[in-house]
Regions:
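Short, conserved DNA-binding cores of transcription-related domains
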Residues: 1-85, 91
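Active-site beta-loop-alpha junctions of metal-dependent nucleic acid enzymes
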Residues: 97, 178-200, 206
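Short, positively charged, Gly/Tyr-enriched micro-motifs
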Residues: 45, 58-162, 201-202, 349-350
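Gly-rich Lys/Arg/Thr-decorated short loops/hinges at beta-loop-alpha junctions or inter-strand turns
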Residues: 90-91, 170-176
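Short, well-ordered secondary-structure "scaffold" segments embedded in the functional core
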Residues: 86, 186-187, 217-218
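Short, surface-exposed amphipathic charged segments that create phosphate/polyanion-binding patches used
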Residues: 167-168, 240-251
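Acidic/histidine-rich catalytic cores and adjacent linkers
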Residues: 34, 38, 43, 136, ...
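The DNA-recognition helices of helix-turn-helix-type DNA-binding domains
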Residues: 48, 128, 139-140, 211, ...
Length: 408
């Protein structure tokens, strides 16, 4: 009765007979059997209960109470009285040819959805790193069979194989990672996009990217019916970069005290003034009093932030044209360069005032990928890296019927 209760409540192996439990050092050994039952011969289909022999299998299970658990499974082999075929009895807790339980395999799959390294997972489950990797490599993720109506693309620094950057394709509307590509080269992107039919590509309504020209050219060439949107973070960053270049150039004119004052105030100078506390606002006003050019650059930056509050494209276009004119006539070289960039990308920028999509979800995925890569000290195998990323977001992918998880 004690063993039965232990089985039901702790082992959760219903239908298994626990014969003996031993603890040696930090390992719990549980000796188990299956009850005798009628089996069907895999060759002729005849029913049999004849036992041929037994063999003991040592099977690793989930740790319990911070200790390793090992099942000693006395497995029967049945024999068919009609054709003589010998075969092992069926069980639900360990796959054929494996030395670990199904639930331990499932725990490996669950833990690899996190950003933990294979080494850390192996340590937590009392398994070797090679076992974790071998189990994980049974997972494969296919590319989506069709593209959704909203497609976003970005890159991250993966340094896998011979390529420095890998591309990530997402559906920000549904919050799904669609695919990871070996690189962001235009030739490879074109080759990938051509997998999808023209009809499917024509059904894509929105295409979102940063301000990298090959992405825009990809949108123009293959997603002719899609509205192109420049990610908000990237065009706002152009303004911040222009202001920062101006600040760094100006602070070099001054002595050590003021130079350090400008440098140490970087965060509050780039932050929107409406989000500053009173004490921070006073500090900013004192800094702007020191230099006229810095003051002009600061108010140009703030004027652009106000454009972001516009509720429609027409208002934003009017405000942006005014801002571009002011920037080009400001006498600040960094803002002239920045304003030219905004002119070149104006249509994609203004589209963001009509539609709610951005690359925010994609950037969030990139940040998580960076943590994964850092924890593992990098990846050399792209296929494994791709599967790990897609598996990490599999709770989202499972909502999409076009992406299937295949476990061998």
């Amino acid at each position: 009765m004690l063993y039965s209760h232990f089985t039901e409540d702790l082992l959760n192996l219903q239908g298994v007979i626990v014969k003996k439990i031993k603890k040696i050092e930090n390992i719990i050994y549980i000796h188990i059997e299956m009850p005798v039952s009628e089996h069907i011969c895999p060759i002729c289909g005849e029913k049999t209960r004849y036992i041929h022999d037994y063999r003991c299998r040592t099977i690793k299970d989930l740790p319990a109470f911070n200790q390793q658990v090992v099942l000693i499974y006395r497995q029967r082999r049945y024999v068919c009285h009609k054709c003589g075929k010998r075969f092992s009895e069926e069980n639900t807790f360990v796959p054929r040819y494996y030395q670990i339980t199904r639930r331990l395999i499932n725990e490996i799959f669950n833990k690899t959805e996190s950003v933990s390294s294979f080494s850390l997972i192996a340590k937590e489950l009392n398994l070797s790193v090679s076992t974790i990797i071998r189990i994980f490599d049974n997972i494969s993720y296919t590319s989506p069979s069709v593209l959704p109506d909203v497609v976003a693309i970005d890159e991250f620094k993966g340094n896998v194989g011979d390529e420095k950057y890998q591309a990530i394709i997402t559906d920000p509307k549904s919050g799904i990672v669609l695919d990871i590509l070996t690189d962001r080269k235009q030739s490879h992107l074109i080759q990938y996009i051509k997998r999808y039919s023209k009809e499917n590509r024509d059904n894509v309504k929105f295409f979102i990217s940063d301000m990298w020209k090959p992405y825009y050219e990809l949108s123009e060439a293959f997603f002719k019916n899609a509205t192109y949107l420049v990610d908000k973070y990237h065009y706002v960053r152009q303004i911040i970069w222009a202001f920062e270049r101006t600040r760094k150039r100006i602070q070099k004119k001054y002595g050590k005290q003021n130079r350090l004052l400008f440098k140490n105030s970087k965060r509050i100078l780039t932050k929107r003034i409406s989000k500053l506390k009173d004490e921070q606002r006073n500090r900013v006003e004192n800094l702007l009093y020191i230099d006229d050019e810095l003051r002009k650059a600061y108010y140009l930056k703030e004027a652009f932030y106000k454009i972001l509050d516009c509720e429609d494209r027409q208002t934003a276009k009017k405000k942006m044209n005014e801002w571009v004119y002011a920037a080009q006539n400001s006498g600040i070289c960094d803002y002239r360069t920045c304003s030219n960039t905004l002119i070149n990308w104006q249509n994609g920028i203004l589209n963001t005032f009509d539609y709610p999509y951005s690359n925010g979800f994609t950037e969030g995925c990139n940040n998580r990928v960076k943590v994964l890569k850092r924890n593992a000290y990098g990846y050399r195998n792209f296929k494994r890296f791709r599967n790990r990323i897609l598996h990490m977001f599999s709770y989202q992918k499972n909502k999409n019927k076009n992406n299937e998880k295949e476990v061998a």
